[in-house]
Amino acid sequence: MGVGTSLVLRPSVPMGHVTGAPYVVALAVARELGGRVRWPHEVVTASGESLVSVDARAGYDEGVFVRCDLVWEDEKGLDAAALERVAGEAVDAWADDVATGRAAAGPLAPVLSDYFDALLGMGEKVEVLRGGRVIGEGALVAVDVWGRATVRLKGGAQELEVAPEQARLRYV
């Protein structure tokens, strides 16, 4: 059975940049657990086993906020308070970077190098799924400063760029 925690973060970032928050949270949780990240923001072991699922919803109520839900299997015995702490600290540091202009290119610009270092699956074969249906097959070749994944389709002549809200990747 899954357990988890939910936290509300209020990063001082433009509304268009809040999409970066779940990536930053996943990166922080992965560091805390000695894990890796699978696109877009799933925390996994080095072998790809799921550790923590990160989901986020943004809104505006007396300022921008992001509600982040972290979910894991009960038998993992993770410390919710520790995960909340590292998530909050990472988002605060990221918001400071955004405020100083380090995210002018996009919300992930300040952390993209660290995200790539933690990312598991670059170059691996994937299926791109939309609505549960395969719409493309190829290899994950990039993630941009907006968090979009680029998949080089079979044959290598075309690339498909997808955002997390458009499609998901299944590693094959």
Tell what function each PLM region has.
Residues 1-172:
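Catalytic beta-strand/loop module used to bind and position nucleotide/cofactor moieties
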